Amino acid sequence: MKSGFVVRSTISSWESAERFCRQFSLPLLDMQAKHNQEVFQLIFDHQNVHLLDCRAKKPLTLMVDFVTGSRDHRRKFGGGAGQAVAKAVGVKGNRTLHVLDATAGLGGDAFVLACLGSRVTMIERSPVAYALLADGLKRGLLQAEEAGDDELLAILQRMTLVPNDGSDWMRDQLASSDSEQPDVVYLDPMFPEKSKKALAKKEMQIFQEVVGGDEDADKLFEPAFALAKYRVVVKRPKIAPLLNGQEPSVQLVGKSSRFDVYAKKKLPE
């Protein structure tokens, strides 16, 4: 079950916050306004957009950062094409793929694929996830440009974010006569965990509390398989049931998660 949140903004970020709230039909409060003490606050300020968990004495903050921290470390030392997600998608050598990530979340796997040369179109329906990811991309592009980091700049330029429901967006593409067919459709729907212990990182606990599990995830499979040119890849917790009950062509099983690969035809060399 999803928890409620409020959107708050400083004066310096009011215009972008107001634009976001209009897009998703959400109310906007300034930083001094009283509210109903919602546990979570989505904050727009001059530095970034972040999600604030107000329950602890020291509030916990969740934001997207492609420039420093764990994502920067993974970009530099993550194992390249040997990573499980890369193997499942089919990243290999100089092969350049267009990947549709129909459940982008906070963009972690999309970033890995973009680091390995793929062009990634990300679809995200949650207003909170979209706001955090869009801000992370915007800041990342600015910081990479300012630092003269051409490699990171090129990576982030290969990532495109669209606010929409993944299933609806794919069906619209199938109905369109001039849409581009992605080589691979990647699905990582939020699996409703029954305990917080199943979510190792505190940040992911917060994220799932606000976004909620994708209870309707099964509806993603049919349009994904119809739209993908070569394969559909589904990331699931290791013990989770198959998406839509569909048997995969092959499975890559890790310690806590697995990748179910549904092949349509062989990827080009």
UniProtKB/Swiss-Prot annotation:
Enzyme Commission number(s) from the entry: 2.1.1.242
The reaction(s) this protein catalyses: guanosine(1516) in 16S rRNA + S-adenosyl-L-methionine = N(2)-methylguanosine(1516) in 16S rRNA + S-adenosyl-L-homocysteine + H(+)
Highest taxon in the source lineage: Bacteria
Major place of residence: cytoplasm
Alphabetic keyword roster: Cytoplasm, Methyltransferase, rRNA processing, S-adenosyl-L-methionine, Transferase
Coiled coil: none
Binding-site residues for S-adenosyl-L-methionine, renumbered to this chain: 124-125, 188
Pfam families the record matches: SAM_MT (PF04445)
GO cellular component, one term: cytoplasm
GO molecular function: rRNA (guanine-N2-)-methyltransferase activity
UniProt keyword Transmembrane helix, yes or no: no
Annotated SUPFAM superfamilies: S-adenosyl-L-methionine-dependent methyltransferases (SSF53335)
Location in the cell: Cytoplasm
Signal peptide from the UniProt entry: none
InterPro entries named among the record's database cross-references: 16SrRNA_methylTrfase_J (IPR007536), SAM-dependent_MTases_sf (IPR029063)
Function: Specifically methylates the guanosine in position 1516 of 16S rRNA.
Family: Belongs to the methyltransferase superfamily. RsmJ family.
Protein name: Ribosomal RNA small subunit methyltransferase J
Organism lineage: Bacteria, Pseudomonadati, Pseudomonadota, Gammaproteobacteria, Cellvibrionales
